[in-house]
């Protein structure tokens, strides 16, 4: 009986702890569901790309990194991805100081490969089973598309949510600035 009572108390304590942690994340989140902010060190993770290669974020220190959280069912993602491809990836893909990874939220590799074909993007796409990488950056139940720009020092320097042309232009300009390149409008 004593063992049963102790086990029950332990389960209640764990449940309360998990709920408190979830409540704390919700309280910390901004109105876009982000739980990370400009100036924060970007949470580390390892992602498996569709080609089987594994990439750990911390191994990219010293580079400017853009994370694009996406999914095949996201209409806004489908709208934004061709612009990411043409205005960011094609411009910087050969720059060794830059990395872009699309992180597909909780879909199997076959779906992600089909999604790549439909959108026509060539930048790396990674798999996020269970949305566990996503949950390091935003509330698990919050929506996508969202982009996180990370500086060479590993700190977040910009976050976007949904596809807004003015905000996207600022993202492009910020990447160019971080890489020491001029935007097309500044030539």
PLM feature spans:
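Short loop/turn microsegments at loop-to-beta-strand junctions
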Residues: 42-43, 65, 144-146
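Thiol/disulfide oxidoreductase modules built on the thioredoxin-like
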Residues: 117-122, 128-176
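Hydrophobic beta-strand anchors of alpha/beta hydrolase catalytic cores
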Residues: 66-67, 100
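A short beta-strand-turn-helix
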Residues: 36, 45-65, 137
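Structural microenvironment flanking redox-active thiols in thiol-disulfide oxidoreductases
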Residues: 78-119, 130-136
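N-terminal targeting signals for export/organelle localization
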Residues: 1-44, 186-187
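Conserved redox-active cysteine motifs that mediate thiol-disulfide chemistry
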Residues: 61, 69-83
């Amino acid at each position: 009986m004593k063992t049963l009572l102790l086990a029950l108390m332990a389960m209640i304590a764990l449940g309360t702890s998990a709920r408190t942690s979830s409540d704390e994340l919700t309280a910390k989140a901004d109105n876009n569901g982000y739980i990370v902010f400009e100036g924060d060190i970007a949470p580390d993770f390892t992602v498996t790309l569709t080609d089987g290669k594994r990439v750990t974020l911390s191994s990219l220190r010293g580079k400017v990194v853009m994370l694009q959280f996406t999914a095949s069912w996201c209409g806004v993602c489908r709208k934004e991805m061709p612009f990411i491809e043409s205005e960011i990836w094609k411009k910087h893909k050969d720059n060794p100081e830059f990395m872009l990874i699309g992180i597909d939220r909780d879909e199997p590799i076959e779906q992600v490969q089909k999604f790549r074909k439909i959108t026509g993007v060539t930048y790396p796409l990674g798999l996020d089973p269970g949305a566990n990488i996503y949950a390091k950056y935003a509330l698990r139940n919050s929506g996508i598309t969202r982009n996180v720009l990370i500086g060479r020092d590993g700190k977040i320097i910009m976050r976007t949510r949904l596809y807004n042309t003015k905000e996207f232009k600022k993202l492009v300009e910020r990447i160019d600035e971080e890489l020491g390149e001029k935007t097309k409008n500044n030539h």
